[in-house]
Amino acid sequence: MDLKLKNLDETKELAETFAKCCTQTESSCVIYLIGDLGVGKTTFAQFFIRYFGFDKVKSPTYTLVETYQNDRADIHHFDCYRLTDPEELEYIGIRDYLKSNSLQLIEWPELGKGSIAKADISIKLSGNAESREANISFESKLGRSIKKCVIG
């Protein structure tokens, strides 16, 4: 599925739609956020997480993971950009994060290959500050069920 995102409001709307649809499942959902620096991966993640009532959402670039928990959601936001070896994810206990019934947003998933779960949904962002494109792949049975909600 390919979408043009003409402005920040459209990115926010897309992220919130995914957040709403992901919570309608009883399973953990893994979303890969793919793209070059500055294409909006972290912005998408922030809008997604804020949908659940979290006001302060920071980038996990230096911490590798930020966790957000409340009565509405259990979210783990990973940023693998600074990994020098996927094994580093094992040191922070990634398997424990992935076992929980939670939502996983993973930026730069290609750098964590072999240590991270397979994607249910992959969102590849491209473009610049003026307009972006999102190429969305629904890669699992769960992902395809979320697609039905997303496209309405």
Positions of the model-derived regions?
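Conserved lysine of the Walker
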Residues: 41
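Short beta-strand-centered segment that lines the nucleotide-binding/catalytic pocket of NTP-utilizing
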Residues: 54-69
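The conserved Walker
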Residues: 37
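Phosphate-binding P-loop
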Residues: 21-28
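N-terminal pre-Walker A segment at the start of P-loop NTPase domains
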Residues: 1-19
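Short phosphate-coordinating micro-motif centered on Lys-Gly-acidic
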Residues: 84-87, 95-152
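Hydrophobic anchor at the beta1->P-loop junction of P-loop NTPases
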Residues: 31-33
